[in-house]
């Protein structure tokens, strides 16, 4: 179900394994994916779901963008047909070690950084999940020794037997509340699924100062604990001391904070998680150090785009929830014109209220319905502007900042 990167990758793997495969997407299918399916002789349909074919399946692989409450998925479930994710399916057919990363914020940066370290170490490694090529397609085209897998809560929802040899949980803050019935515990439970099936010799890397993780941890079995925190505490696998980043296990080493290529407190935590994950995998400390120095960052994540007439333009469009906006604002050193918009997912903007008052000189809203944003920020006394295209939005920001 679904014919994007995830669904088509799963279809190719299933075809190569000898299964009868049918791909159905209620929306249009991109030409590149039609070509991929046609090249393998895989039957597909778009803009409809033919229930007679779908409900005849022995198993359904669901793309993460399709909610379990979608009418066709409810019919599939009612028919007793198992519904799994592409990651779950691909995991059955590889012996590669899985380093899996989730969290409300920092997933893409941390996943990319871990992948960078493994590549610098010369390992046979793939980048998959919510980033890069689908895991299933990589397994189909030629397996790896390691996969670095970014996992969203949507992907974790339909995973059951999959095992993360190294599970990384960066943080848990409200996100996708619309998808989880506006129930925070449902979202938390989805994130903690990353620990299911871990064995004692696996590793669980996590932010020790996250109150939700600390509260929930006792409910789950997991591998060996590798907590990280800004300040040292008993059992910390990484922490800071004075101007140094200290890694304590399995192989102790340290480096100066100013050597890290990524800046900001949130990126310090991302670097800790990545360094521990590589350390657990047995990568030499010299390689980890050098890779943490040389990493160039991720597109659209606090990406410095241009400096025009003394005004710096920063693209942080990967910040898709309130908490990630908080981290971005915290890192701003100058007065900021903040662009907010997109789909409201049950957001609580009170988390960024103090920083908006402190850091921002104007707010620009970009979205179909900005009423909630205007209602919340209207009393702040800041200039506010409605825009309806990115071109109009940037032009307005340019005027304000001059």
Label the model's feature ranges.
Residues 9-17, 255-361, 375-376:
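Nucleotide phosphate-binding/pyrophosphate-handling subdomain across enzymes
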Residues 4, 26-29, 131, 209-210, ...:
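Residues in the short beta-alpha loop(s) of Rossmann-like NAD(P)-binding domains
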Residues 20-26, 204-208, 339-340, 359-368:
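Short internal beta-strands
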Residues 45-48, 84-88, 222-240, 289-293, ...:
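Beta-strand->loop->alpha-helix junctions that form or flank phosphate-binding loops
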Residues 15-16, 51-57, 64-208, 212-223:
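Phosphate-binding loop of NTP-binding sites
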Residues 1-85, 89, 375, 385:
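N-terminal leader/targeting and accessory segments in enzymes
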């Amino acid at each position: 179900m679904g014919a994007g990167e995830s669904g088509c990758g799963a279809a190719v793997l299933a075809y190569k394994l000898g299964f009868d495969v049918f791909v159905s997407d209620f929306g249009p299918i991109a030409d590149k994916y039609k070509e991929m399916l046609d090249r393998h002789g895989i039957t597909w349909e778009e803009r409809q779901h033919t229930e007679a074919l779908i409900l005849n399946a022995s198993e359904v692989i669901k793309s993460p963008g399709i909610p379990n409450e979608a009418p066709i998925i409810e019919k599939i479930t009612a028919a007793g047909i198992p519904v799994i994710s592409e990651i779950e399916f691909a995991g059955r057919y590889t012996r590669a070690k899985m380093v899996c990363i989730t969290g409300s914020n920092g997933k893409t940066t941390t996943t990319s950084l871990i992948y960078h370290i493994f590549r610098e170490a010369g390992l046979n490694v793939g980048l998959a999940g919510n980033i890069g090529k689908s895991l299933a397609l990589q397994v189909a085209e030629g397996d790896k020794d390691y996969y670095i897998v970014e996992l969203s809560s949507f992907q974790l929802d339909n995973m059951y037997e999959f095992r993360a040899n190294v599970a990384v949980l960066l943080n848990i803050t409200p996100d996708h509340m619309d998808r989880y019935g506006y129930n925070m515990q449902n979202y938390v439970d989805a994130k903690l699924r990353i620990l299911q099936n871990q064995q004692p010799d696996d590793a669980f890397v996590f932010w020790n100062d996250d109150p939700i993780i600390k509260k929930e941890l006792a409910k789950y079995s997991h591998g060996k604990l590798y907590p990280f925190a800004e300040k040292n505490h008993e059992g910390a696998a990484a922490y800071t001391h004075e101007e140094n980043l200290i890694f304590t296990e399995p192989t102790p080493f340290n480096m100066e904070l100013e050597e890290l290529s990524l800046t900001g407190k949130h990126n310090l935590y991302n670097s800790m998680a990545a360094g521990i994950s590589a350390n657990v995998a047995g990568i030499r400390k010299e390689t980890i150090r050098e890779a943490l120095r040389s990493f160039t960052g991720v597109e659209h994540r606090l990406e410095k785009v241009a400096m025009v007439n003394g005004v710096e333009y920063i693209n942080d469009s990967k910040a898709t929830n309130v908490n990630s906006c908080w981290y971005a604002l915290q890192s701003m050193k100058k007065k900021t014109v903040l662009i907010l918009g997109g789909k409201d997912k049950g957001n609580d903007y009170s988390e960024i209220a103090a920083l908006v008052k402190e850091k921002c000189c104007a707010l620009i809203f970009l979205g179909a319905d900005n009423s909630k944003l205007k209602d919340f920020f209207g009393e702040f006394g800041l200039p506010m502007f409605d825009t309806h295209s990115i071109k109009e939005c940037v032009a307005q920001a340019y005027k304000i900042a001059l």
